[in-house]
Amino acid sequence: GTQVVEVPVKAVEEDKVFTKVEIEAEYPGGQGAWGNYLRKNLNAQVASDGGAAPGSYTVIVRFIVAKDGTISEVTPETSVGYGMEAEAVRAIKKGPKWTPAQQNGNVVKAYRRQPITFVVAEE
């Protein structure tokens, strides 16, 4: 069988930013609420206005969710272009505080990678 070995963890460094956590930071209300927020606040026209060909484009934005849920260091990881990364960054920065990540039962500061898909319809 498999064994679980508990390794004692030293006190979590106050300013450490986790990349892997047991419980990911999430938008308040979960994925459904996040989808609703994006539909209301993301300008989906940015891609077509920017001249993107019809199709589906996914941009990935990385940011830090602090222990109090505030968002910082919002940066695009992709370079699809047509203004999509800038629009995704704007929408995330303007949103509410997130529910912070947890590690070993403690609220921690953690990175979050968030894909956002833009769809450009055929005219």
Segments predicted by a language model, with ranges:
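Charge-biased low-complexity segments
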Residues: 1-123
